[in-house]
Amino acid sequence: SRPKPKSASLPSLDPKMAEHYAASGLSEEEIKLFRKTMADLAEQIRTIEALTQQVPKLRALTLNTDLVDLLHAYFEALVQAPQRLTDAGTFVYQQVPNLLDLMQKYAQITHHEVKTADTYETLDKAFETMTNMAGKIRTDYQAFIKDDLDDLDSDVRLAKKHLEPEKTHETEWPTWAMINKPIWRMIY
């Protein structure tokens, strides 16, 4: 059977998302490109999900690596930071398409009635490659959100610092060094 033609037009842009994209610094043309790219990526992720439901070994792969959740999380992080599309280029233009291609071929070969030892060896290599790809996607996703994690970590440390009671000792007398400091040093 032939693949169904995709609709050339994208759904209308939600006003909140339009505002988000504009606030991210994207021009009208960049918004169109981003939306088209993300629509293609979403379709690829949906196809990967469908394949994982059809082939038990692929389902096991996704369960062991959290692949589907990882793909969705990376997609969502990219939607939240559309100006960073180039930072996620490997994910968008290489990793997901290559993973999808491997999964489609894997599913096709898995459904063959007769398999030889070479077939099983090839399937094992493909499975190992897909597992490694999932690990690489995880590593790249963690690098993509690292700034967000660093910001959160800084905020948590600051909040903890404000929660701690101030360490003052009422009975402590100022030392000569404290009294003798020029005022400008105490301010800075």
Predicted regions, residues:
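Membrane-proximal, non-transmembrane interface segments of integral membrane proteins
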Residues: 2-78
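Soluble C-terminal extramembrane regulatory/interaction domains of multi-pass membrane proteins
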Residues: 62-188
